[in-house]
Curated annotation (Swiss-Prot):
Residues 364-390, 412-433, 455-468 have a biased composition (Basic and acidic residues). Residues 486-498, 730-749 have a biased composition (Low complexity). The keyword Coiled coil applies. The lineage of its organism: Eukaryota, Metazoa, Chordata, Craniata, Vertebrata. Residues 160-175, 789-805 have a biased composition (Acidic residues). Residues 403-423 form a coiled coil. One of its GO terms (biological process) is poly(A)+ mRNA export from nucleus. Residues 391-402, 750-763 have a biased composition (Polar residues). The gene is ZC3H11B. Keywords: Coiled coil, Metal-binding, Repeat, Zinc, Zinc-finger. Gene3D superfamilies: Zinc finger, CCCH-type (4.10.1000.10). This is Zinc finger CCCH domain-containing protein 11B. The keyword Plastid does not apply. Pfam families: zf-CCCH_3. It comes from the Eukaryota.
């Protein structure tokens, strides 16, 4: 198959990569041969090896220089049919240069083509858009040289044609900008086309328009200036730019064109008014107008229509220019008036003419600043002195600043809100501090209660004045409600608290129950207040596995309250009388005795941290919830740094025997004691209680766990020192119950049972028997009312214990 059919072009002139699979003929005998096989042309060549080409050869490749000869590698084809000027080595064989000489024939047809297309080039020059004198001179030089022929046939437009179709095409395509520049070109074409068929008509037109003259450059410039001054830059720019280039155009191509120009210049009379536009339109075959002086405005109109501009008569142009001036003037007026921030009419004008005018950023800022300034002034007039200090200061700042950006306004608003919140929080914290102070003063003396009322009412009024400006939150409403409830409770508890010192048992029980409920309310309100305020509350939890009690929390007030109450309690120490304080202790003990305290399972550990001694009374608020979760809120104040070094750890004792000594009327509630016979009491020293995370100034803390009934009551236990009670005890009782080193295991367990019953029911019994006196003494010891600590050394005698107490 490769030896049949047509030749493979790539095999003979290049390299065929298909090899035997190529459907075309590969014949090595025909390589380098450019003779076509005549038998193949007739379709009768059946030779297996034909030395002639089975291909139509339309080019003389021997006259075409080889492309690869000029490459760095050179031509490496053995049978290359192209022309080689130099000899070459191919596979070790030297091939001489081609014998045939390259003819110069290919250049001569190009010259002929150039000569034949000179007229076409000149016609093309007349149609080109940018025909400035410089470009024309460049084109003349190029046309005189050998310019290669264009790749596509040029569009030749005969300027002598009178067809209206061509004119319409010109006007539609928007090529009218070229028409004034064609002023001398018709003569050029007429001079070139002397042999054309349309020459007589052109000659007739030349005779008709021999009366027009070619203007000089100065005349054109002067007329342009006049037109510009008349039309004030509107509409005249297009026409004057069109009339810019007519003078230097004549005679750029040939001598016969110059002869035509000579005939035209001979007929020119300088005194006449040149009719340039009329001659142009007639010679170019454009729309013909009447040959009178009325032809100028229609020509202007046609030029404007061609340019796509709406050029009106000069009267309308002069009417338009004052409009422009008026518009610009009104713009300046508006800008000038709107610069005044107090002028509201100017802003109305700006809104009216806002359809045309686009405001800048500065104008908008000025208007907004003026509006804000006016609003602030009206607010100041209406509100007057009834405003708060914050609002007046904000209004002054807004009145002093005239122009503010959005970011500045937002920053000021945020700053005001932050200041208001700071003031409010400060007042709330002061109110809460005064409230807590009033609670502490209430338990100590009655006269400070009245003073603390007055102090706590002032910040409440201040917060109300602040809340007139700001919206109240739920927390603020809760705080106000808590203050009102506190004031009402203070007024209600003032009268019974005066009679608390009387030793009447039943009356005291009734009064303490009332105070329990009220103190519980105060506790709940204090928790809400503590949520809002910034007063730190240090809390600790001790997990207690009891049937009715789960969690005990201790909250300790801040050291500032301690310092304030320290001074008050130093004064109170001098005024306090021991007898009514003993009555208070008795009443509170009877109240505590009413609760079944010993309802704990065996093995419960009681964490009792030794409390530092103090002469003043302390307030212990015990709150029991419905699920019997007890929250012990110990608000106390003591001289911490003086007595801290004297504190010694108490002993850890176990209890094996439970003794219940109670009054007959409390017997039903004491039945729980028999069900839990063993209770462990562990008294830890203060140094081991690291749960309370307090600074060194606040290290005096109380961990006390009291198990109460599920009744929802709380008690305020005021206590005081009672050194005389310890002297009443006989030595036998104290030795049998309170000095464990001298007693065996059961006696020490009995002593620990007495110590455990610091909050039990037997403390409420009147001091009739020796055992009840000792229970009262142990209650005072556990409550922290010791002036000197108990030192249970084995060397001490039984009689030394009351002396130490």
């Amino acid at each position: 198959m490769p030896n049949q059919g047509e030749d493979c072009y790539f095999f003979f002139y290049s390299t065929c990569t298909k090899g035997d699979s190529c459907p075309f003929r590969h014949c090595e005998a025909a390589l380098g041969n450019e003779t076509v096989c005549t038998l193949w042309q007739e379709g009768r060549c059946f030779r297996r090896v034909c030395r002639f080409r089975h291909m139509e050869i339309d080019k003389k490749r021997s006259e075409i220089p080889c492309y690869w000869e000029n490459q760095p590698t050179g031509c490496q084809k053995l049978n290359c049919v192209f022309h080689h000027n130099r000899g070459r080595y191919v596979d070790g064989l030297f091939l001489p240069p081609s014998k045939s000489v390259l003819p110069t024939v290919p250049e001569s047809p190009e010259e002929e083509v150039k000569a034949s297309q000179l007229s076409v080039q000149q016609n093309k020059l007349s149609v080109q858009s940018n025909t400035s004198p410089q470009l024309r001179s460049v084109m003349k030089v190029e046309s005189s040289e050998n310019v290669p022929s264009p790749k596509h046939p040029p569009v030749v437009i005969n300027a002598a044609d009178d067809d209206e179709d061509d004119d319409d095409q010109f006007s539609e395509e928007g090529d009218e900008t070229k028409t004034p520049t064609l002023q001398p070109t018709p003569e050029v074409h007429n001079g070139l086309r002397v042999t054309s068929v349309r020459k007589p008509a052109v000659n007739i037109k030349q005779g008709e328009c021999l009366h027009f003259g070619i203007k000089t450059l100065e005349e054109i410039k002067s007329k342009k200036m006049k037109e510009k001054s008349e039309e004030q830059g509107e509409g005249s720019s297009g026409v004057s730019s069109l009339l810019l280039h007519p003078e230097p155009v004549p005679g750029p191509e040939k001598e016969n064109v110059r002869t035509v120009v000579r005939t035209v210049t001979l007929s020119t009379k300088q005194g006449e008014e040149p009719l340039v536009r009329l001659g142009l339109t007639e010679t170019l075959g454009k729309r013909k107008f009447s040959t009178g002086g009325d032809s100028d405005p229609p020509l202007k109109r046609s030029l404007a229509q061609r340019l796509g501009k709406k050029v009106e008569a000069p009267e309308t142009n002069t009417d338009e220019t004052p409009k422009k001036a008026q518009v610009s003037k009104s713009l300046k007026e508006r800008l000038g008036m709107s610069a005044d921030p107090n002028n509201e009419d100017a802003t109305d004008k700006v809104n009216k003419v806002g359809e045309i005018h686009v405001k800048t950023l500065e104008e908008m800022l000025l208007e907004r600043a003026s509006q804000k300034h006016g609003e602030s002034q009206t607010k100041l007039k209406t509100e007057g002195p009834s405003k708060t200090d914050d609002s007046t200061s904000g209004a002054r700042s807004s009145s002093t600043i005239r122009i503010k950006t959005f970011s500045e306004v937002l920053a000021e608003e945020e700053h005001r809100q932050q200041e208001a919140e700071r003031q409010k929080s400060k007042k709330d914290t002061t109110c809460i501090k005064l409230k807590t102070d009033s609670e502490i003063k209430k338990t100590v003396v009655l006269p400070p209660i009245v003073a603390s009322k007055g102090q706590s009412e002032e910040p409440a009024g201040k917060t109300k004045s602040m809340q007139e400006v700001h919206m109240k939150t739920v927390e603020e409403i809760k705080l106000e409600k808590a203050l009102r409830v506190q004031q009402s409770s203070e007024s209600s508890t003032s009268s019974p608290s005066q009679h608390e010192a009387t030793p009447g048992a039943r009356l005291l029980l009734r009064i303490t129950k009332r105070t329990w409920r009220k103190e519980e309310k105060k506790l709940q309100e204090g928790n809400e207040v503590d949520f809002l305020s910034r007063v730190r509350m240090e809390a600790t939890e001790a997990s207690v596995e009891t049937t009715g009690v789960d969690i005990t929390k201790i909250q300790v007030k801040r050291c500032e309250i301690m310092r304030e109450t320290r001074m008050q309690k130093q004064q109170e120490r001098e005024k306090s009388v021991l007898t009514p304080l003993q009555g208070d202790v008795a009443s509170c003990n009877t109240q505590v005795a009413e609760k079944p305290v010993l309802t704990a399972v065996p093995g419960i550990t009681w964490h009792l941290t030794k409390q530092l001694p103090t002469k003043s009374s302390q307030k212990v608020e015990v709150e029991t919830s419905g699920i019997a979760d007890s929250l012990l809120n110990v608000k106390w104040s003591a001289q911490t740094l003086e007595k801290r070094g004297e504190a010694k750890p108490t002993v850890n004792v176990k209890q094996s025997v439970v003794k219940v000594v109670s009054s007959p009327k409390l017997a039903p509630k004491r039945k729980a004691v028999e069900m839990h016979p063993a209770v462990t009491a562990a008294v830890k020293p203060l140094s081991s209680s690291s749960v309370l995370q307090e600074p060194p100034a606040k290290k005096a803390a109380v961990d006390a766990v009291v198990l109460l009934d599920s009744e929802d009551k709380s008690v305020t236990v005021p206590e005081a020192e009672n050194p005389r009670d310890s002297l009443v005890l006989p030595p036998t009782q104290s030795s049998s119950d309170s000095s464990p080193p001298e007693v065996s295991g059961p006696s020490s367990s009995q002593m620990s049972m007495k110590t455990r019953r610091l909050s039990s029911a037997s403390t409420g019994k009147p001091p009739l028997s020796v055992e009840d006196d000792f229970e009262k003494l142990t209650w005072e010891i556990s409550g922290g009312k010791l002036e000197a600590e108990i030192d249970l050394d084995p060397g001490k005698d039984e009689d030394d214990l009351p002396l130490e107490l």
